[in-house]
UniProtKB/Swiss-Prot annotation:
HAMAP family: NDH1_NuoI (MF_01351)
Lineage start: Eukaryota, Viridiplantae, Streptophyta, Embryophyta, Tracheophyta
Sequence positions that bind [4Fe-4S] cluster 2: C74, C104, C107, C110
Protein name stated in the entry: NAD(P)H-quinone oxidoreductase subunit I, chloroplastic
EC number: 7.1.1.-
GO CC annotations, alphabetized: chloroplast thylakoid membrane
Location(s) in or outside the cell: Plastid, Chloroplast thylakoid membrane
Annotated [4Fe-4S] cluster 1 binding sites: C64, C67, C70, C114
Gene Ontology biological process terms from the UniProt entry: photosynthesis, light reaction
Intrachain S-S bonds: none
InterPro entries in the record: 4Fe4S_Fe-S-bd, 4Fe4S_Fe_S_CS, NADH_quinone_OxRdtase_chainI, NDHI
Family of this protein: Belongs to the complex I 23 kDa subunit family.
Membrane topology value: Peripheral membrane protein
């Protein structure tokens, strides 16, 4: 009879322990149920980028003086600047300016050291294409005004705050 009573006590202790573990699991589950979802439904929801985000480079053709500082400070000598010297006015005339975003590392040196501020970073980060040659942007593509995520009414924007 003693074995039967000790077996019953052991069984009841194991049952209480199992119920406690299940209760702990439920409390963890319920504490996570009140949180906002971490997953962002990408094409329909986008994160608002920070002020210092390094996206696509915007180029203003009229401000550029073809000094080639951007080429000298670039760690991979990426910007291609074509110019000709106008002898009558003794100034460089910019002919073509292009950047290949397939190679660009978005370090921001060209923007930081540009004396005329003709280069700036935008918040655009969707540069993917099926053909890598489409990532070579000339002055016309670089001069296109940046598309703001906030202005698109079809997309729900999400502000993420880091602690």
């Amino acid at each position: 009879m003693f074995l039967m009573v000790s077996g019953f006590i052991n069984y009841s202790q194991q049952t209480v322990r199992a119920a406690r573990y299940i209760g702990q699991g439920f409390t963890i589950t319920l504490s996570h149920a009140n949180r906002l979802p971490v997953t962002i439904q990408y094409p329909y929801e986008k994160i608002i980028s920070s002020e210092r985000f390094r996206g696509r480079i915007h180029f203003e053709f009229d401000k550029c003086i073809a000094c080639e500082v951007c080429v000298r400070v670039c760690p991979i000598d990426l910007p291609v600047v074509d110019w000709k010297l106008e002898t009558d006015i003794r100034k460089k005339q910019l002919l073509n300016y292009s950047i290949d975003f397939g190679i660009c590392i978005f370090c921001g040196n060209c923007i930081e050291y540009c004396p005329t501020n003709c280069l700036s970073m935008t918040e655009e980060y969707e540069l993917s294409t099926y053909d890598r040659h489409e990532l070579n942007y000339n002055q016309i593509a670089l001069g296109r005004l940046p598309v703001s995520v906030i202005d698109d009414y079809t997309i729900r924007t999400i502000q993420i705050k880091f602690n």
